[in-house]
Amino acid sequence: MPSFDSKAFLKSVTHQPGVYRMYNAEADVIYVGKAKDLKKRLSSYFRSNVPSEKTKALVSHIHQVDVTVTHSETEALILEHNYIKQYLPKYNVLLRDDKSYPYIFISQHKHPRISIHRGVKRKKGEYFGPYPDSGAVRESLHLIQKLFPIRQCEDSVYANRHRPCLMHQIGRCLAPCVKGIVSDEEYKEQTDFIRLFLQGKDRQVIQTLVKQMESASQSLNFEKAAIIRDQIQAMRRVQEQQYVSDDSGDDLDVLGFAIENGLACVHLLMIRQGKILGSRSFFPKIPANTDKEEVFLSFLTQYYLNHTQGRTIPNRVVTSFEFNSEDLERALTELSGRKVIFQLNPKGIKGRYLKLADTNALTALTSKSNHKLTMYQRFKQLEEALVLSSIQRMECFDISHTMGEKTVASCVVFNQEGPVKSEYRRYNIAGITGGDDYAAMAQVLERRYSKQLDIDKIPDIIFIDGGKGQLNRAYEVISKHWEDWPKQPLLLGIAKGVTRKHGLETLVKISGEEFSMPSDSPALHLIQHIRDESHNHAIGGHRAQRAKVRKTSTLQNIDGVGPKRRQALLQYLGGLQELKSASVEEIAKVPGISHSLAEKIHDALKHG
């Protein structure tokens, strides 16, 4: 037990607001906290009758405490959040959410493009959002394309088109890329409608469209009036689906909360301008014996202060969980420059959505708990099958290529909660003979394990997707590096077996011994899971590599088609897919392409 002189330490602590960091004997930050009164708060940790088991465990590991005095409680709240994000302390509740939130982006262009955007806002244009997940953005874009047919294609495609694409033919794009189809004024009007729609001003758009429809009818332009009528009806259907609040400017987050058996879930229902944008479940990492209020308040603080993820602070946060919200309300009001309030158990439609959020939180928590239990049972079954005392971490490797080209290796990581996707890695393999899987495996393992590993990153099992040959090559590489490791991982090959059927895999040990497991074995299901994850991760990387060269590789094999002609073909016809569907006569219209060469290109693309 570390010798920390709390009495001597507390003598030097001020009564001002601030943040404190607690360190263990290894100089790791194990807890970060804030206080209105540092002396009063820190003194509470070292009383003889501390009721919390979590606090007792924390205090038993304290070796040093650093204090930072701040000017205000808001400053302390922000500094606490930054320290938690920096150090990821063991005894703090941690929000594991490093993904930036997506936006809908309208580019600054003569004919603007609408698209999904993540990350830093470097491009010139307008950003609408954020949305809770990419699925919600894609759904919104799909909806917008039905209502307002402006382009979603890349600028490079737009600049090189000479005829309308399929999206125009099915009424999803006005085809501004081709002269004479739509005027700049008409296109701008549809873009303006999208801006108003995304700002929640649906009624203004409908009023404008109704006037246009009446004007078209009076001018006897019934075809145009019918098109506008359909657009109005589509917008009204959308209004019925998304409508939540009588206040069209109502921005609020509805938070459902559930906690049980050391797991917690916060379900966020995001409503902006009175419309539901989508929802998302969060599962904070909780130290043992943490009380509910600390879990919920830690989530709120980390979620709303994390500006780097592009989140917006709503005017109102609705929840059924009662907690002391004064400090956070004050901080969020100060940060956003407007009044932010937390509303507890409202009535009416907000109350119904709160009930829905609470139900979703409990459902997601139950599902997560069942998954965790299943994963835990599978790990225990695998420990028994392989006669191992404990399995905390596993890694699996696979190789993917097509006829030896664009070889990609993958490494996936599992712990007792399942896949650790943040630690998945892909490796582009180079400098080997095409198709030499042994050399590819040797290269990825050398790159993976030749560097210094943290103790907790050393796997208990390393799976190799392959038989004896691959496993022996893996052993040659890894065994050179594990002499300095505190433990030696078990190496296992996963061979597909004679019939190559799922469930009939053969497992291979480094000794050459082969064995199998029953097809209904939970241990085998875990092995199949990590093998399939590795396989899919490798294939995904390989396909991405192939896609980079796909546009030109098909044309590279045609005699008489050099770089300039390839570029002319793709630019004139608008891309490889359009070129493949073009007739000989259409190809022959491309500058520099004779009729005989057009026939050769057409034949190569159709039958090559």
UniProtKB/Swiss-Prot annotation:
Q: Which subcellular locations apply to this protein?
A: Cytoplasm
Ranges for domain GIY-YIG? 15-93
- Family annotation (InterPro entries): GIY-YIG_endonuc, GIY-YIG_endonuc_sf, GIY-YIG_UvrC_Cho, Hlx-hairpin-Hlx_DNA-bd_motif, RuvA_2-like, UVR_dom, UVR_dom_sf, UvrABC_protein_C
All residue ranges annotated as the UVR domain in the record: 203-238
Its main localization is: cytoplasm
Cross-referenced Pfam families: GIY-YIG, HHH_5, UVR, UvrC_RNaseH, UvrC_RNaseH_dom
Sorted alphabetically, which PROSITE patterns does this protein's record hold? GIY_YIG, UVR, UVRC
Keyword annotations of the record: Cytoplasm, DNA damage, DNA excision, DNA repair, Excision nuclease, SOS response
Q: Does the keyword Cytoplasm apply?
A: yes
- State the Gene Ontology BP annotations: nucleotide-excision repair; SOS response
Q: Name one GO cellular component term.
A: excinuclease repair complex
Subunit structure, interactors included: Interacts with UvrB in an incision complex.
Record's function text:
The UvrABC repair system catalyzes the recognition and processing of DNA lesions. UvrC both incises the 5' and 3' sides of the lesion. The N-terminal half is responsible for the 3' incision and the C-terminal half is responsible for the 5' incision.
Protein family according to the UniProt entry: Belongs to the UvrC family.
Q: What is this protein called?
A: UvrABC system protein C
Annotated gene: uvrC
